[in-house]
Amino acid sequence: MRYNQFSYIPTSLERAAEELKELGFDLDLQKTAKANLESFLRKIFFHYPDSDYPLSHLIAKNDMDALSFFQSEQELSKEVFDLLALQVLGFIPGVDFTEADAFLDKLAFPIHFDETEIIKHIHHLLATRCKSGMTLIDDLVSQGMLTMDNDYHFFNGKSLATFDTSQLIREVVYVEAPLDTDQDGQFDLIKVNIIRPQSQKPLPTLMTPSPYHQGINEVANDKKLYRMEKELVVKKRRQITVEDRDFIPLETQPCKLPIGQNLESFSYINSYSLNDYFLARGFANIYVSGVGTAGSTGFMTSGDYAQIESFKAVIDWLNGRATAYTSHSKTHQVRADWANGLVCTTGKSYLGTMSTGLATTGVDGLAMIIAESAISSWYNYYRENGLVCSPGGYPGEDLDVLTELTYSRNLLAGDYLRHNDHYQELLNQQSQALDRQSGDYNQFWHDRNYLKNAHQIKCDVVYSHGLQDWNVKPRQVYEIFNALPSTINKHLFLHQGEHVYMHNWQSIDFRESMNALLCQKLLGLANDFSLPEMIWQDNTCPQNWQERKVFGTSTIKELDLGQELLLIDNHYGEDEFKAYGKDFRASKAALFKGKANQALIDILLEEDLPINGEIVLQLKVKSSENKGLLSAQILDYGKKKRLGDLPIALTQSSIDNGQNFSREPLKELPFREDSYRVISKGFMNLQNRNNLSSIETIPNNKWMTVRLPLQPTIYHLEKGDTLRVILYTTDFEHTVRDNSNYALTIDLSQSQLIVPIASN
């Protein structure tokens, strides 16, 4: 374990003493440091009628227990304080450590003893994470140190778990959206699942916009999947044009229906544990699946601003600008009289994507988004540089396949009976519009590109993204983060994992940082919290996070690739082609070992190479035919210890998100020896070699200059490392699988790897 503490708010002595007193700690500035520490320790053992007993189980020195120490005349020293602090945080002498000083250095322990600062040290200790993954104060509150009185209690600028999660209100309302996506002449109704604590005060809201939450149709999804085996189409030379079109919602009228009290209820919905954490701290949770999902009406428009509007309508309702009904019969309306109108959206992948889309509408009431692994351009999710390009791990998926997965109205047999025929017509229109044949950008994709509206974002923004996420690739967050207005507060966590949540990792206090931010933005707490704009997980060692100023630098280093002419054959033998088609992982293994159809260049680094941004391959290339697909991957190659990309559970249920509520495991990325690490990758239809909007012809056997931008990253390579460049055609995981008989030739003498270099 190593501390990377970004959530602690430095506090004055007076404020620290005041907050400790509010928690019931009997500390006094006139007492000695030793007396105050003893008083603190006895208080945290509140379960024991006799606190001598638990004190006797701690050691103050290697030869003295804590009870004996406090009964002695010995002075409090750094040695004693450190040893007791470690034990209070759950670290066991002789098990977790033998030498306290060395262990504290390894932990990067954030508290440095000064006898005159004991009150501040105790305050800081309470806000520091235990071995279990919870801060000490959260751990104590979870054990019942504070009663669940359904009111706010704050410590170090963060809300504590004092809302009773055993008496939650669970209710359903149906919000009227200014849409008619299924063309039935009726406004679409949007089902909203609300979970809120009982409270006399208006509550802020965490909203998870999740098209998955009302169920998914995996059978329809699997039937809709496309075969990837097809020839790469030769496209006509042309220029693509699109237009920016404002989404115009329908006009609704004020509702004059009576207020209803008898709301639909529910017992369970698959919740997001970060939401649960805030539910216990006085934040209502709502889950919304939007148009075309079970319990709602409308068509699943998948990624456009009509779908976004169905979520926006819910924020409007929370602020009194839209109508919600108690049921589909629409006999009574219901108002969000429990809400303070301020909303933060949460969630990963499609959920975070909807958060980004919502933010670009500039809707009033949306104070903040926490968007993890989020898409900012749907074209870049299902296409790349003029190619059909599947997200990592999902060959054959496309946006209409996702529509089938999430159109959960068809999971309700009655809805299927009444609406499926019309749904199939609308789905067919969507399938035609996305143009899987060419892979080109068009108006359909432009209408699902949130980047063009990034200037309209006015809420605070928090993004997290994995630099090993080949599902929602790093370009998605790179482009939206760098497009955000300079006038807003923005934050980015870049981790070394894949497509995963990071709120329950051991090495980073993400959850507590979000608590401080949300108390600022949604509760109006003046806590003086300041979070760095960008925090990056160091890839060279375990559990080390660093502040960064930018994602993407203009300083470059050009690396020569060699002097040879390299030939890349596209065609595989029939058996090999079929085998790779059945198991794309086998093709990846062969590729990384140099056993596939590829050109391979190894570069031994003579100095450190700190990459920050978008690596570009500038290549001199020719094709034997009038078509060509170019794929590339950059590897950190050779055996050494690296971070894994999938977090593993260190404990099973040590994190309590309330008071014995929604427990979850503590996780972390492992650090272990392996043979390589993918740094970046990229794909291109050579007919789109100049830009996305220009389709060019490919002259047979004529040299072309190609600039292939790879996925942006921040990655540190060290002197002596090997950087491996792999050039090839078909990627069996991502691209179409064209097995026609053509070849690419690369002139390495006129090719370079252009690397953006991080400044010191």
Swiss-Prot record:
Belongs to the peptidase S15 family. Removes N-terminal dipeptides sequentially from polypeptides having unsubstituted N-termini provided that the penultimate residue is proline. Its main location: cytoplasm. The active site is at S349 (charge relay system), D469 (charge relay system), H499 (charge relay system). Pfam families: Peptidase_S15, PepX_C, PepX_N. Homodimer. It comes from the Bacteria. One of its GO terms (molecular function) is serine-type peptidase activity. It is found in: Cytoplasm. SUPFAM superfamilies: alpha/beta-Hydrolases, Galactose-binding domain-like, X-Prolyl dipeptidyl aminopeptidase PepX, N-terminal domain. Keywords: Aminopeptidase, Cytoplasm, Hydrolase, Protease, Serine protease. Its EC number is 3.4.14.11. SMART domains: PepX_C, PepX_N. This is Xaa-Pro dipeptidyl-peptidase. It catalyses: Hydrolyzes Xaa-Pro-|- bonds to release unblocked, N-terminal dipeptides from substrates including Ala-Pro-|-p-nitroanilide and (sequentially) Tyr-Pro-|-Phe-Pro-|-Gly-Pro-|-Ile. It is an enzyme of class 3 (hydrolase). GO terms for biological process: proteolysis. GO terms for cellular component: cytoplasm. The gene is pepX.
